[in-house]
Amino acid sequence: MPNNSNPISNQPLAESLKVVNVAVAVIHYQQQYLLGYRKREQHQGDRYEFVGGKIDINETPVAALIREVKEETGFNIAGNVILKLGRLHHDYGDKQVALHIYKIELSAEQYQHYKQQEYGLEAQMLTWADKDLLLNNHYPLPAANRTILAWLKLPKCMAITYPLAHFETPDSGDSLATNPAQRWLKYHQQQLSYQGWSYLRLKLAQSNNNTDKEAEIITQLLAIRSDISAIVPYRLRKAIDFNHLDDLKNDNISASTNQPTLNQDNLPISAYHLTQTELMAWFSQYQKQSSHLDSGADSNDDLSYDSSSNRATAEVSCRFDLDLLNTSDQNTTGLIISCHDAESIAAANQLANLRLTLSLAPVIAIFLSPVLATQTHPEQTPLGWQQWSALAALADVPVIALGGLSPAMSDLATINGANTVAGIRSFQEGV
């Protein structure tokens, strides 16, 4: 059955003179992804693209998706689970384009039926692209599709490390009994899945000393387990010493192994994590700056203007706390943001849109929690799947379900709008 529980996906889009709404279908079977090919005479021609097309006035995005895929390729996806990945907003001056992106996994029977089809019903070439080649830019895509590739790197399941406090009481016979940090390292070195995604956090009280301590412990784990795709607290991004990490990594490999020097581009850090508190602190500052612009900024104010640019460009060029929009900062790594309510999701959407406008690394996803009751936060009232799904529909980026879940609940989570499920205990399988 199609995933029609998404309240936004099932609402017809109102007519707009400026906004062109487009439904985009990321169709795949396991690691094979369907791409069309834009003809040379088309805008951004001679490039591959995900199939889809314009959403008609008063048509729902999901209905448009099913119709466009059928008209372009002949594929019938009406019975498949249709997962919202996100929405991308582009301003071209004379018009605005909103891409509504959905992910659809074909059954084995559908794939066998469709895989030999070399051309669509509009005579466009069709190609099945291997995911690894697709993510490594083997297939040139329009610039607007680059964020989609970052989203596709997300796994089905994601591990979260235990807080350091969990290791303050040693197990019987533990030789590292006096050092919780070493026990934390030993446990996660052994238990984090090989080449898996892992959110590395120790949950220490924030202080300068603890920032350095947390960065040092995480650096040691990254040196030992450089295979993982790590998510690291955003506040540690300047505390991690790349040279020290490189030295530690070399200490853990044979002298004959040729390892590149580590830097921002080849670190095993796939994303930085923002807490909801950090997000809302940024958003409050953003709103103050926006109000300042609305009231008429003085030319001597500390704002970066281009006199030929419109207000939106001036808006996103302001300097904010956390440097989240600073084009000269190290913003080449994407973000994952924790959200717990509609207000924080709206703030995350705003940040995602501004970073897209500035061509910064995208907001890859949000953590939305808690879905169910948890042992770690028994005081928090769980959302339940119905409320969780309604909130997930508001997000312009993929949503990671968190709170009381296990990997076995992945399919249920997908039906409710989750791209990924995450947790602590049951998500750490060992190497």
Predicted regions: what is each one?
Residues 2-34, 87, 102-105:
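Conserved N-terminal beta-strand and adjoining loop/helix that marks the start
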Residues 29-72, 229-231:
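Conserved Nudix-box catalytic region and its N-terminal flanking loop in Nudix hydrolases
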Residues 43, 47, 119-199:
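Nudix hydrolase/Nudix homology domain
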Residues 87-117, 131:
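Active-site-adjacent beta-strand/loop module that shapes the phosphate/pyrophosphate-binding cleft
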Residues 218-229, 383-400:
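Alpha-helix-loop-beta-strand connector modules within alpha/beta enzyme cores
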Residues 238-248, 263-264, 342-354, 405-420:
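Catalytic cores of alpha/beta
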Residues 277-280, 367-378, 412-431:
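Glycine-rich phosphate-binding active-site loops on the catalytic face of alpha/beta enzymes
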Residues 341, 384-387, 397-409, 413, ...:
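Glycine-rich adenosine-cofactor-binding loop
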